[in-house]
Amino acid sequence: MAPAMEYSTQNGQGEGKKRASVLAIGTTNPEHFILQEDYPDFYFRNTNSEHMTELKEKFKRICVKSHIRKRHFYLTEEILKENQGIATYGAGSLDARQRILETEVPKLGQEAALKAIAEWGQPISKITHVVFATTSGFMMPGADYVITRLLGLNRTVRRVMLYNQGCFAGGTALRVAKDLAENNEGARVLVVCAENTAMTFHAPNESHLDVIVGQAMFSDGAAALIIGACPDVASGERAVFNILSASQTIVPGSDGAITAHFYEMGMSYFLKEDVIPLFRDNIAAVMEEAFSPLGVSDWNSLFYSIHPGGRGIIDGVAGNLGIKDENLVATRHVLGEYGNMGSACVMFILDELRKSSKVNGKPTTGDGKEFGCLIGLGPGLTVEAVVLQSVPILQ
């Protein structure tokens, strides 16, 4: 199958080094979605919390300020009625959550993977590695094994499973895939990030207000990428983005700023008030280290895929770096149309970037710019910085 979009054969090779490239992207969401303006009623009604009127008003204000228009979910009103433990704060519902996630997470990942494979246009037998990331449940063998079987991949496929890394895991998965692609001749790596909020859905509770912050943002989605070095142009492979470097940094002084723990009630997360300033005040050092080899210091000369962990985080990071709104359109679009899908978000943004660049007549997949940065943000606090190079679009 021919690629849906035509790109240059540029593959980022230089100075004798094989560079990994993104060769295809696929994304998907559950069909069920809820408009953000309707979510407070849905949430409080289905958790039998309508009597908590003051908390509901607070939740409404959080939703309004989120700049999210809609979110997609596996959990529907019917499913919540059938699983009252999930909708009851503190109830022992881990078994019910796991039953959902063990099936639905690989299934959603499979849907995204099939889209990426179709765009790639190569035989599925060429996939040599799988990297699967999720913070939605856990099992043995893992979701990496299940999706390998669902897709009918070779039994010799080499798998990496990244469980419970949190929202920065999209960057982690790309970093691992880059190393695999560049250090294994002919490797083609299927990267899958799939998230389902069944593990973190909780009823509101006055003594744990972090819950309602997450309920106003988190959502379900999956993204898949094919990563490889030296695209086989003769067979129709084309780079979408080139991956120049990838790094991970623990933010100093951030221990305990975002944590999550598993209980009989599922996964419960805890947020400190200084999350935004910690990311904001430390992002410049990360960017300087990532881009100094390229001699880049003008942050507005780049395109961006910033994990949309919330409007405040985007505003904080962008404000510190002086990034103009025009360079954040794709990031804010994904936040608005999908919410925070955890590890999958940054890949949705890459997909939006290359598609909007084509629609708007830009010369490259990076909104007309040559270099860009994918920024994963999450627990630790941890920052993943993936330096990308766009490729020319053949108009």
UniProtKB/Swiss-Prot annotation:
**Transmembrane stretches, by residue range?**
none
Q: What's the impact of mutating T135L?
A: Changed substrate specificity and catalytic activity
Query: What is the relationship between temperature and activity?
Result: Optimum temperature is 35 degrees Celsius.
Q: Which domain of life, per UniProt?
A: Eukaryota
Q: How does activity depend on pH?
A: Optimum pH is 6.5-7.0.
Tell me, which GO biological process terms does this entry list? benzoyl-CoA metabolic process; malonyl-CoA metabolic process; polyketide biosynthetic process
UniProt keywords (A-Z) are:
Acyltransferase, Transferase
Q: Which reaction does it catalyse?
A: benzoyl-CoA + 3 malonyl-CoA + 2 H(+) = 2,4,6-trihydroxybenzophenone + 3 CO2 + 4 CoA; 3-hydroxybenzoyl-CoA + 3 malonyl-CoA + 2 H(+) = 2,3',4,6-tetrahydroxybenzophenone + 3 CO2 + 4 CoA
Q: Where is the active site?
A: C167
Impact reported for A260G: Loss of activity
User: What InterPro entries is this protein classified in?
Assistant: Chalcone/stilbene_synt_C, Chalcone/stilbene_synt_N, Polyketide_synthase_type-III, Thiolase-like
Query: Is Mitochondrion there in the keyword field?
Result: no
Report the EC code(s) recorded for this entry. 2.3.1.220, 2.3.1.151
Any single GO molecular-function term of the entry would be: tetrahydroxybenzophenone synthase activity
Q: Which CDD domains match?
A: CHS_like
**Which function does this protein serve?**
Type III polyketide synthase involved in the biosynthesis of benzophenones and xanthones. The preferred substrate is benzoyl-CoA, but can also use 3-hydroxybenzoyl-CoA with a lower activity.
- Return the similarity comment: Belongs to the thiolase-like superfamily. Chalcone/stilbene synthases family.
This protein's assembly is summarised as: Homodimer.
Q: What else is known?
A: The T135L mutagenesis transforms the trihydroxybenzophenone synthase into a phenylpyrone synthase.
| Name the record gives this protein | 2,4,6-trihydroxybenzophenone synthase
